[in-house]
Structure formats: C-alpha cells, structure tokens
C-alpha cells in the first residue's frame, strides 16, 4: 500500500483516488510507496494528466483540471459552475504509475491492465488498443 499525498485542489477527489488505487491493486498491480498527486494549470491544452517516475520511492501524477470537458452544470442558476476530472483519466494516470506499466507507455502491459479495468470495473481508461474495440 502506498502513502497518498494530495494537494488542496485534488482533495475533492480523494475518495475516487483511494478507490481507484485499491481497484488496481486488487488486479495484482503495485505502486511505489509514495504517490504525490496535484493539479497543474495550462502547460498544454491537450494534456489531461502526466505521470513522473522518480528513482527513489516517489511517483508524481499531475492532473490538468482545466483541460477536462466534464462540466458541472448547476440547474438552479443554469450555468456551468466548474470542470471535473474524469474517472477514466484518474485510472489512466494511475495505470501509468504502476510498477508494471511505467516506462512502457501504452504498451503490452498497459493494454493488459486497460482490459482488466474495462472488464472488471467497466471503465475504459483509453490510451491503448483494447481487445474490446
């Protein structure tokens, strides 16, 4: 089990992160002892998340909340009130953070994990050709 550190903006997603980490570990995958998760703003309009692997016991995952297209709509005031991370992006970056999938991009092991997540949890994490496409 890893120690999870979230910045203030990511705290609203803590239950999703904890569940996703547990789900991936239940499939037989491992994480580094320290997972740092925080948000970043505007380095790229295309990047939803990025995972950095360090030579110590640390893995850093950054999420760009602003680049996600899942909008929170407030029907009381009839306006978009915020943007949320998608669950599939959370699982996608956590898949890259596993010991088994890191440094291999969207290769064979990532594809295997994607298929397991899709089959078990019905979440398509994207990024690799799936047997279900």
Give short role names for the model-derived ranges.
Residues 93:
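Walker B catalytic acidic pair
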Residues 1-88, 97-133:
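Active-site-proximal or metal-binding-adjacent scaffold patches in catalytic folds
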């Amino acid at each position: 089990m890893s120690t999870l550190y979230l910045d203030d903006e990511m705290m609203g997603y803590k239950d999703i992160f904890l569940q996703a980490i547990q789900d991936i570990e239940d499939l037989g995958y491992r994480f580094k002892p320290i997972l740092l998760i925080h948000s970043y703003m505007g380095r790229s309009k295309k990047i939803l998340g990025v995972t950095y692997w360090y030579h110590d016991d640390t893995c850093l995952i950054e999420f760009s909340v602003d680049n996600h297209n899942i909008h929170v709509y407030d029907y009381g005031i009839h306006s978009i009130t915020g943007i949320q991370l998608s669950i599939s992006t959370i699982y996608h970056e956590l898949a890259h953070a596993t010991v088994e999938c890191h440094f291999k991009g969207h290769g064979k092991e990532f594809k295997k994990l994607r298929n397991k997540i899709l089959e078990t949890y019905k979440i398509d994490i994207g990024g690799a050709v799936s047997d279900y496409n």
